Amino acid sequence: LKFERQTLRDVLNFHEVKWLEDPTNSDDSFERVRVRKLLTSFAELGLDKTKISKTASLMQSAKTALNHFAVDCYEKFGSCMYGDIIFDFEEFSNLPLDIKRRLLAAAQQWVSSQKYRPRLSQIDALLDSINEKTAFSGSGTICYSHDKSIKITRELNSCVNEIEAVNGLIFDNRWELSTSANCTEFTVKCLGENGLNFLDANVRKEIPYKTIIALPALFKDSALIDFPFLNPQSK
């Protein structure tokens, strides 16, 4: 908004930089084109590009401040364990609505390794489920209440199926495999129900069910070889 398109063209021409005009810039089927044409009408009403640009700048400044506060809140009563993002339920409940939304959106985006944050409608649905203390599935994550806390964990059905046990490979865009030798006869995949059956009943209780089944483990065919978060004990 700070610069006219013609100004940008002039700069490119001055520096003899080749450029192409985007043909969609004159296509009214695109919202941005229709909005750009409306700016002329807005200017006649006193709402010119300078004022809109200033408003956008103020909104960006407010966004930066809110994000800073959200980070501060996470550092005070948030944590990360077994790849889950965890919030204290009571502390989270006392936050302003906007900060709750920012924390949940960031948590879902981080846990799922998605490029874009979830839609606002999904975050609000997630907030409703938190207030009702029911589980919520969305954006490849599951959010649920556990021991006076809110947990955002990876959804098992959204995880990558499996990868070969090769040093340096990344599983599910989250976990890096570190091994002294490549073991291509082994695979890395989520622990799942099958792997869970290899663990002693008392050991399973150390990690919540929804979390543990989506954690990576080392398998040979269907047999659990290693689960780095616990010491598996064969039945």
Regions found by a protein language model. Name each.
Residues 1-56, 88-90:
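Catalytic subdomain that performs nucleotidyl-dependent activation
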Residues 45, 56-235:
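AMP-forming adenylation/ATP pyrophosphatase catalytic core
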